Regions:
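Two-component/phosphorelay signaling modules centered on CheY-like receiver
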Residues: 14-32
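Acidic catalytic/metal-coordinating carboxylates
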Residues: 36-39, 62-65
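Active-site beta3 strand of CheY-like receiver
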Residues: 47-53
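Receiver (REC) domain active-site loop signature in two-component systems and cognate sites
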Residues: 58
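Short, conserved "switch-loop" micro-motifs in signal-transduction and mechanochemical regulators
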Residues: 85-86, 97
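Short, glycine/charged-rich "phosphate-handling" switch motifs in NTP-dependent
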Residues: 100
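C-terminal output helix
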Residues: 107-117
Length: 122
């Protein structure tokens, strides 16, 4: 049996972390979560992930700072920004700092799963 892809969800919204975790586990992924940017950085330092789903606006350390850390220290980890602030400026900043894609909240599960599968296969 193939090893499951490991995904880290970094978002300060409790409900979103819970629901998205459940949906992604149901889709066959191994999931870990972090409630803010600092927790997200700690998780990436301590465990191997294939993909990080990353909110932008969070307490302690915002998503762009986490993205910069990941791309500098763990460039093999893919990142999809998942944010309620889906404007052109944030999309451009995300790409500038190395995110593979950008998905707005509220997300459509089928679209998000398609994006995750595409990014993981690249």
């Amino acid at each position: 049996m193939a090893e499951k892809n490991r995904i880290l969800i970094v978002d300060d919204e409790d409900a979103l972390r819970t629901i998205l975790s459940s949906e992604l586990i149901g889709a066959g992924y191994e999931i870990a979560t972090a409630a803010d940017g600092e927790e997200g950085v700690a998780e990436v330092k301590n465990r191997k992930f294939d993909l990080v789903l990353l909110d932008i606006h969070m307490p302690k350390l915002d998503g762009f700072e986490v993205l910069k850390f990941i791309k500098k220290e763990h460039p093999e980890v893919k990142v999809i920004m998942l944010t309620g602030f889906a404007d052109l400026k944030n999309a451009i900043e995300s790409k500038k700092y190395g995110a593979e894609d950008f998905v707005s909240k509220p997300y459509d599960l089928v679209d998000l799963l398609t994006t995750i599968e595409r990014v993981l296969s690249e």
